Amino acid sequence: MFFFHKIVIPIIIGIIQGITEFFPVSSTGHMIIFIDWLDIKNKDTKILEIFVQLGSTISVFLFFYKKIIQILQLPMQKESNEKKNIHVLISILPTMFLGLIFYNKIKSLFNPTNVMYALILGGFFLIIAEKFKPKKPKTNSIKEINLVQSLIIGCFQTLCLYPGFSRSGASIAIATLLGFKRSVAVNFSFIISIPLIAGASVLDLIKNIQNVNMLNIPYLFSGFTISFIISFLLIKKFITILNKVSLTFFGIYRFLIAGIIYFI
């Protein structure tokens, strides 16, 4: 049992996080389901979820760091870049604000039943976005994103606070409805995910730091490492898939997982 809990579990959870992070299917929801099914929910797995999310977030940062630097630096085109900074800030503020205020309530929702409901609702949202998106994209680069679009994306992104809804699912779906080219919606979604997930992970870690000790550090580090490696090696391939595959496919996948939760 020691081998299973301390070695196999962090590897599996790291793989789950590393794969599902890049699709609009809720990586958090998948981890909640897996941990509940194996009946292994405890202080260690709670901390492990934080570490594996940090692993995939760092891989996203490394993949997008050139685009992030272009947004954050203020060279000759100062006004333009400041504008981009504001866009990113506006897109993350609603979720940060509500996440801080309702932190304890949000954490109380972390169970398979709530994940099932969120998977279904999020699935419908993805299918609706695919069906009713503008025939021709109106926003073809991150530079073209305006403040109103950023605010709308930020508001809809708060749906991810309900476990299982999917942050990328909410942001990509609403961006698609707003007329974003798919690659722009995907890139912007992942760029604004970095400060959100990093901030949420740090907050979770601070609130649970008492559960980190010398005995579980190897366990946590192995989950972090697996998540980072899987994410880093596959991110380019996964984003290519996400740019090409219909959102309806992911909506149907979410329905299937919700059905499995219901019947099992």
Curated annotation (Swiss-Prot):
A Pfam family hit: BacA
Highest rank taxon of the organism: Bacteria
BP term (GO), one: regulation of cell shape
Entry EC number(s): 3.6.1.27
GO CC annotations on file: plasma membrane
Transmembrane segments: 7-27, 45-65, 86-106, 109-129, 145-165, 186-206, 215-235, 244-264
InterPro entries the UniProt entry points to: UppP (IPR003824)
GO MF annotation, one: undecaprenyl-diphosphatase activity
Membrane topology type: Multi-pass membrane protein
Catalytic activity reported: di-trans,octa-cis-undecaprenyl diphosphate + H2O = di-trans,octa-cis-undecaprenyl phosphate + phosphate + H(+)
Compartments in which it is found: Cell membrane
Top EC category: hydrolase
Purpose: Catalyzes the dephosphorylation of undecaprenyl diphosphate (UPP). Confers resistance to bacitracin.
Further remark: Bacitracin is thought to be involved in the inhibition of peptidoglycan synthesis by sequestering undecaprenyl diphosphate, thereby reducing the pool of lipid carrier available.
Family of this protein: Belongs to the UppP family.
HAMAP family: Undec_diphosphatase
Protein name (record): Undecaprenyl-diphosphatase
Source organism (scientific name): Buchnera aphidicola subsp. Schizaphis graminum (strain Sg)
Taxonomic lineage from the root: Bacteria, Pseudomonadati, Pseudomonadota, Gammaproteobacteria, Enterobacterales
Gene symbol of the encoding locus: uppP
